[in-house]
Amino acid sequence: MKYDTTQRVKIPARLQLVSFFSGGVTMILELTGSRMIAPFFGTSLIVWTALIGIIMTSLCIGNWLGGSIADKNPNAKLLGRILIFAAIIIAITAYFSNYILTALQGLFLNLYMSSVFSALIIFAPSSILLGMVSPFVARLAMHNVDSSGGVVGRLSALNSAGSILGTFMGGFVLISLFPSGVILMFAASVVALLSVLVYTGAWRKLISIAIFMSLFGGAYATKIHGLPFSPIGTQLDTQYNHLSIVESVDKRNGRRVRILITDPDAVQSLMYTDHPAELVSEYTKFYDLAFHYKPDTKKILMLGGGGYCVPRYLLASQSRDISIDVVELDPGITQVARDYFSLKDDDRLKIYHEDARTFLNRAFFNENLEQYDAIFMDTFTSATVIPFQLTTVETAERLRKLLKPDGALIVNIIASMYGPKAGVFHGIYKAFSNSFSTMMIFPANAPNPRYAYALQNIILVAMGDTVSTVSPTPDAKYSRLLSHQWLEPFTPDPRVPAFTDAFAPVERYALVQQNIN
């Protein structure tokens, strides 16, 4: 028998729309999920891996279940029920995720377990239901085996196209405009509306519309009033971060401190509310060493803005002819610094909103490059993780070209001097020593060798020129900072590689630090 394959099977528009928008909602759910987990467990590679892995596994289970059920009962009413249940589950996720994440955080599991259980409990149910949609739609659209390939192909393409739209809408638009809970409520509303397309009975359509209106109204109310049980303080979402601004008291002196938090395990920036230009964090004071090693320092590059504590301090304490270029990835953080951390416009301050490595790459190939007197680096993707692309031999080459021969590169690293928590520091030290002839180490928190295995801020000062690493008569202003210098011979661990663009296992070494702590 010869089949006529010239006839193109017409797929009902309602099924095409269901396939398209269910794919978009799935990707929005995944992107928004990362923002909901971030305040509790960070945004490290481990968290992303767990989230993507669990959602993909759930979709796989949903595809299998949906196909099996559709073969036994290819009924549009059943697909409508699946969509309604998915909408309700997504709405429940929006309202109760903070309760669940807070409870999981209280169990003090390691990051692997916390990330997996968070994704499993919060996102697996809705992902399984959404995964059931595609095979169910394909079965409803399929009338005979002759056209099965074309039907499945077109519906798969529509689902993928929806996923693409959801990815760009979620990443470029929604997350920067709305809180995570609002996005999930809107997603739930869309899924509820899809059920209207597949239901045939009038009363079922009315029920679906009622659920849609309830969820849509919930999204609006959520935007106005916020979700219950959010972490304390002001909560903000940007394109790159979930930010918390809280206030506390510095136990050392009883003064009020405003704190910017981008990771649950560490603070990003601190500011005294009664004197914003004064530095709070001990490690930030070590950037002053640039003026010790090069007293005529005027032009400074800072990679990583955060709360702009260091630029604010330098603009207040240095002469009028100083100039500071700050490279900060997240424009939202800069706006928070303006709104909450006393960052003012200043003709001596220039801000670049881009990835620090792309800035270095562009400057590296600029024939009219104007070198800097000092470069400060304070960049983190989570509590202790420096972006790997800023820790490598290739990065050091670019930094060296941007820095004057007698200028100082000052890098903040969170690690230990020796032991299992030292991997990040040793890898960066090896990578940077290829380009800088002078490398000086300043344990900012505990300089005594007995604390060599303690996790702390380690300040690495690198210079292109060979200079005396010990100043015989330091200015009194710098004496305390210089007393932290590590003067014992330092030998990097031979088991730790010099980080390169091709291989920089920063996440693995940082995870060891967290697990040991």
Regions found by a protein language model. Name each.
Residues N241-S244, Y453-N517:
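SAM/dcSAM-binding transferase cores
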Residues S281-K298:
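Conserved alpha-helix/loop element of class I SAM-dependent methyltransferases that forms part
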